Amino acid sequence: MKIRIGHGFDVHKFGGEPPLILGGITVPYEVGLIAHSDGDVVLHAISDAILGAMALGDIGKHFPDTDPDFKGADSRVLLRHCYKLAMDMGYSLSNLDVTVIAQAPKMAPHIEAIRAVLAEDLASEICDINVKATTTEKLGFTGRKEGIAVEAVVLMIKS
């Protein structure tokens, strides 16, 4: 059995108009994230992790922010595209672990809904998807509520 690990990281700055979209769901918050696409920092980190595991570069290579076709793009569509590339190479998701780093908004009320979206988009069981959140104890840009950072790790197995 061939196994591949991918790590993804993404950051977006607060300041855009609502909605705030995280993990494919709308999270109530007074501002959105500034981005070329819909700004879903969670799905961007996961997409990067999948592309990394497959040695296919990153989301900037596949969906450049200089391309007007991706202006306001739905990050769920981008994630499904990245996962299809992996499936076309004969791989499927074994498990996913995501860490959302944000002082605000509070993520706990939204984690199960995000897990359900991810399980659907990645054709996986919800028990193979973990999403957790942490703060930086008011330190750094996330602690000052200037933005959100996300790390994602995927384990992909050859089908």
Curated annotation (Swiss-Prot):
SUPFAM superfamilies: IpsF-like
InterPro entries named in the record: MECDP_synthase, MECDP_synthase_CS, MECDP_synthase_sf
Gene Ontology MF terms: 2-C-methyl-D-erythritol 2,4-cyclodiphosphate synthase activity; metal ion binding
Cofactor: how bound: Binds 1 divalent metal cation per subunit.
Pathway: Isoprenoid biosynthesis; isopentenyl diphosphate biosynthesis via DXP pathway; isopentenyl diphosphate from 1-deoxy-D-xylulose 5-phosphate: step 4/6
Top-level taxon in the UniProt lineage: Bacteria
Known cofactor(s): a divalent metal cation
Enzyme class: lyase
UniProt cross-references to Pfam families, sorted A to Z: YgbB
One GO biological process term: terpenoid biosynthetic process
Oligomeric and partner information: Homotrimer.
Name of the protein in question: 2-C-methyl-D-erythritol 2,4-cyclodiphosphate synthase
Species: Shewanella pealeana (strain ATCC 700345 / ANG-SQ1)
Gene that produces this protein: ispF
